[in-house]
Amino acid sequence: MACACCCCTASLAQFGKCTPSERWTYTDAKTGNKITVLTDTLKNDRFLYQTDPMWTADGKYLLFRSSSRGDGTMVERTQPNGEKKKWKPTQIYFIEMATGKIIQATEGADLGNAFLANRSNKLFISRNENHQWKLYVMDLDRFFADVEHDKVGKPAKYERLIGIFPAEMGRPGGYAVDCMDDYAYITVEREGTEEEKERMMKNAFLPETNQPIKIKPTLCGIRKMNLQTGEVTKVIDTEFKVGHIQASRFTPGEIVFCNETGGDAHQRMWYCTADGKVFKPLYKETALDWVTHETFATKDYVYFNILGFLPRLRKQANGIYRINLRTDDVEQIGQVEMEKDRCAIDGQLVGRGFWHCNASRDNRWAAGDTFGGNVWMMNVATGERHWLVSDTKMRPDHAHPSFSPDGTKVLFQSGHFTNGKRLNLMMVDITNYK
């Protein structure tokens, strides 16, 4: 009844808007698995990147983002360089897993990134307001209670401003929250010195002649914001573009990030501690390795891919690997059967093998999506492979599989029903797999 009431107030405000469940199921024609579709095919929804938490701490709500569920209003802003930019803002939504109903949790044009707390039902939200990067925290328990009783107030009722990022400490980008929910680790671009810029360009990765340079090298770094006081301090500086920052969900003060080139790199994965005392490569690459899509999956392990999508890359070991953070030992988890995964997908690279990976928190399962548009799961102890899902199209975004915190479900996104034009958010139950 509460959901129906909330739907009636949708015309008054988007924040707190509640819509009925869009959940339905189908049977995968190739694998025979029953797939649960969580969102409507008419929308274009996306999960967060598979490295970031998507479940509230109590496991009752699942977060996603969408630019197609609001009122359709386009926003136009004048940029600092005088250019005008027009776009449809992305907002944050939650699926109540018990009922399937969908709740809008943000509104407005200034949303940056969102990150769920680890220890309580809170949501950290960055916004770019008046050319300032601000970090807020939202009380989700209070918000969901008001949604249930159709008494949602303005966003300010549920949010607290944590801090404003000092401009002199760099230009903020993505961030991750420590497992104790006491610090946010924030990537920045910075000016640096001429000597740093010279070293950066000298050491920059040069791809093969047929590969474009997608992301130019940039002096960057990591800063941390105290989530109680808003104080910002330096962690490290880098002489490469920092991307995919992740904080351990198990051990305080451990950070994994990458040298983001948009493709290959001399050294993709890096590790540091929040006090800046440790800053080192994670898995020292050979010249033939193409490492990508690392995931800080468990207490002691980071999972990653060594790609095999090109003929030259298949002349050596490739697939999903993991590295032990305590010993630096590296183990291969496995690879799909290459010939079975060969597939030409319009608008994508033609290749074979795993593209992204993840692992269950108990180290029992690893999952990966492939260039052929399939989602597989592997038993980490035995190497046994299970084909979960077929034909995700890998567009307009990749499948990006991830596990529910209790390890019973694999979540992914798929363009299967729209021929790659829009995404459905989906999940498959894995409790019957041994």
Residue spans of the language-model regions?
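Bacterial Sec-dependent N-terminal signal peptides
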Residues: 1-14
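Conserved beta-propeller blade repeats
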Residues: 45-63, 108-127, 163-189, 237-258, ...
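Blade-level signature of beta-propeller repeat domains, shared across WD40, Kelch, NHL, RCC1
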Residues: 398-434
